[in-house]
Amino acid sequence: MRPKPGTGPWWDQRYRDGRDGWELGEPAPPLRHFLATDPRAPQPPGRILVPGCGRGHEVALLAQCGFAVVGLDISAEALREARRCHGNGSDRLQWVLADVLDPEACLAAGLAPASCSGVVEHTCFCAIHPSLRQAYLKAVCELLQPGGWLLGLFWCHDQPDGPPYGCDPDRLAADLVAAGLEPEIWQPAEHSACGRDGRQRCDEWLGLWRRQP
């Protein structure tokens, strides 16, 4: 029987089959450039969560920057690949198999409410079904400390189906505000690698959002 779409076993099969057109083999260029050059970029120390981390390229980058980073994914196969690429973990890098939408699983993994100073979003939001997006943003906001930040790179496209599912930047901004986040940066991303996975009409938006006290 085929795994249910969006579940851990379903993503496991995609990794095993090589159906990973989102994969760049490196951290997303807009995030890497922003963290390296923008004076508004968050600075260590801090505990950072990367939900839907996949092979963990952003996790490794953030650990190199000096953050303590938790790479979380529902796919055991993705985390196996992450360990192969970046090691089993260290005092600044931890891999966790859990669903960010499951608060009990997060708590069991040491991710209590308000336990993170930051969250870095890259390909998790576009991977989950749009019907779960408000729940996802609420879960992320609850994991942030008051005043904590969300740094996100979001795929915005109008093509049907997914994943990756598209979004409208204005609607997404409204949803982020509704979840309890205030914008500090919300703009088209520079150095975008969009167009992967055969999608030619796609814009990436970069945002830095702050949880309201």
What are these regions (language model features)?
Residues 123, 127:
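Short catalytic micro-motifs in class I SAM-dependent methyltransferases
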